[in-house]
Regions:
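Aromatic-lined carbohydrate-recognition surfaces of secreted/lumenal glycan-active proteins
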Residues: 1-22, 61-72
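Aromatic- and acid-rich polysaccharide-binding/catalytic face
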Residues: 19-43, 90-93
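Substrate-binding cleft of secreted/luminal carbohydrate-active enzymes
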Residues: 61-121
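Extracellular/periplasmic catalytic domains that process cell-envelope and extracellular macromolecules
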Residues: 7-9, 25-29, 58-59, 80-82
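Structured segments of extracytoplasmic/periplasmic soluble domains
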Residues: 2-7, 54-57, 88-94
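Polar/charged alpha-helical tracts
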Residues: 10, 49-56, 76, 105, ...
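Substrate-binding surface in catalytic domains of secreted glycosidases
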Residues: 35-56, 61-62
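Alpha-helical scaffolding within the catalytic cores
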Residues: 16-24, 45-54, 70-79
Length: 121
């Protein structure tokens, strides 16, 4: 209510970030469903299971996002499965810089793929 009634903002998107259905406020209050995922070990994944978990919490189809990830999704798996993640954000520092979590080649492959929307599009 603060942003809408006091600041008079009318172009907000409300993001719910949790895999737990118990905390879901309801479809009328949420525009985007998301979740944070930090795998304990590296594996190629499109995060399909996690996608299915969060969409099961809604009765309407919502935009779904990976709010924070350690390992970026595998672009080849995403192309094949067509999981409609709207966006992902790789967390900072060691998750973005260096080769421990996401290699430069993996990151470059994702950003250069047709699956990614780029600024010039």
């Amino acid at each position: 209510e603060y942003y809408v009634n006091q600041k008079h903002l009318d172009n907000l998107l409300w993001v719910w970030n949790s895999p737990e259905a118990e905390g879901y406020p309801g479809d009328e209050y949420v525009d985007v469903i998301s979740r944070d995922i930090y795998l304990t070990e590296k594996k190629a994944t499109d995060y399909k299971e996690e996608y299915e978990e969060i969409i099961a919490n809604t009765t309407n189809q919502k935009v779904a996002a990976l709010a924070e990830v350690g390992y970026i999704p595998d672009v080849d798996m995403l192309k094949k499965s067509r999981i409609p993640w709207a966006y992902y954000m790789s967390w900072s520092k060691e998750f973005c810089i260096g080769e421990q979590y996401n290699t430069v080649a993996e990151t470059k492959k994702m950003y250069e793929s047709d699956y990614a929307i780029k600024l010039e599009q």
